[in-house]
């Protein structure tokens, strides 16, 4: 009986650790999806910019709290794109779109790996819970034995 209780404590601890890891992975997955959506929006914006015939189109520049300023795109053939670590480079719109497509593929890979890891953790959580339940059932059955 004491051995069973120690095993249950161990399983409970393992379950808590796995739950914490799963929660972190779920949060990471959410952040990856948000970042991917932002990159997708930028890519679509650049693709739409290419379709505009005006040389210097007028735009609305967001300044926060749902407020905007009117602006003019001075150079619609080039975009300044973040390359990470606080650095940005100027690229042609076509190059910027290609760069963003690569970044989207990287996000897709990271999302897929994170989903797989989360699925694996959820399976392990189920296995640990099942094992704990089996031990509890054995303990319950042991206490109901009829003596002759």
From Swiss-Prot:
Organism listed in the record: Pyrococcus abyssi (strain GE5 / Orsay)
Top-rank lineage group of the source organism: Archaea
Primary gene name: pfdA
Lineage, uppermost ranks: Archaea, Methanobacteriati, Methanobacteriota, Thermococci, Thermococcales
Primary residence: cytoplasm
Role, per record: Molecular chaperone capable of stabilizing a range of proteins. Seems to fulfill an ATP-independent, HSP70-like function in archaeal de novo protein folding.
SUBUNIT field: Heterohexamer of two alpha and four beta subunits.
Protein name in UniProt: Prefoldin subunit alpha
Keyword Repeat: no
Record-linked HAMAP family: PfdA
Statement: the UniProt record of this protein carries the keyword Transport: no
């Amino acid at each position: 009986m004491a051995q069973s209780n120690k095993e249950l404590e161990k399983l409970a601890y393992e379950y808590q650790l796995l739950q914490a890891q799963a929660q972190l992975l779920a949060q990471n997955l959410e952040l990856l999806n948000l970042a991917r959506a932002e990159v997708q929006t930028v890519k679509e914006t650049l693709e739409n910019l290419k379709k505009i015939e005006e040389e210097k189109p007028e735009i609305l520049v967001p300044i926060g709290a749902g407020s905007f300023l009117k602006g003019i795109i001075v150079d619609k053939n080039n975009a300044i794109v973040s390359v990470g670590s606080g650095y940005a480079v100027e690229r042609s719109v076509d190059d910027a779109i290609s760069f963003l497509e690569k970044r989207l593929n990287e996000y897709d890979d990271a999302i897929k790996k994170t989903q797989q890891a989360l699925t694996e953790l959820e399976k392990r959580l189920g296995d640990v819970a099942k094992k704990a339940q089996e031990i509890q059932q054995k303990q319950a059955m042991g206490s109901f034995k009829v003596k002759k």
